[in-house]
Amino acid sequence: MVKVMVVAEVRPSEDVNKVLSAISNFFDFEKTNTRKEGIIDILVLEARTLKSLLKFHRVLRNERILDSARKYLMKGIEGNTIAFMIHKQAAAVGVLSFVDNDKESPLGAIKFYIEYQNPKEVVDWLAPRTAHGVPLWDNPIPPDV
C-alpha cells in the first residue's frame, strides 16, 4: 500500500493558494484537508500512488541534485516511511531545496511522508546513485501495491 502525505503550515501572513501552488510544483495530490492549530492552518495533502511524485522525480534530474536528494531520502527512512522536508519559499518559485529542520525555512518547511513496503526501492527510483553526476541506473516507478 502506498501513501504519500505532505504537511505544511499556512501562517496568517501567507496565502493558502500560494502554499498549495508551491507544493504542486513537486506533488500531485488527490485529497486536501485543513485543520487549525491556534492562528495557523495546517494543510494536509494526500495521494495513494507514487505517480503523485513524478514532478518531484523530474525536478531532481533537472536540478541535478540526485546525490543530495539521495542523502536526505536515505536519512529519512524509518521503518516503511521516508520523511524529509523542503524549503517552502524556494518551493514557491519552483526550486527544490532540502532542509534539515523546520527552522531553516522561516515560514515553516514543507514536510513529505512516503509510506511504502520497501522505502529503499522508492529512493532508488527517485534518486539513484550517480557516478560523475550520471545516474548508475534508471529504475521504473515501483508498483503501487
Swiss-Prot record:
Domain of life: Archaea
Pfam families documented for this protein: RNA_binding
InterPro entries: PAB1135-like, Ribosomal_uL5_dom_sf
Family, as annotated: Belongs to the UPF0201 family.
NCBIfam families given in the database record: PRK00447.1
Protein name according to UniProt: UPF0201 protein M1425_1179
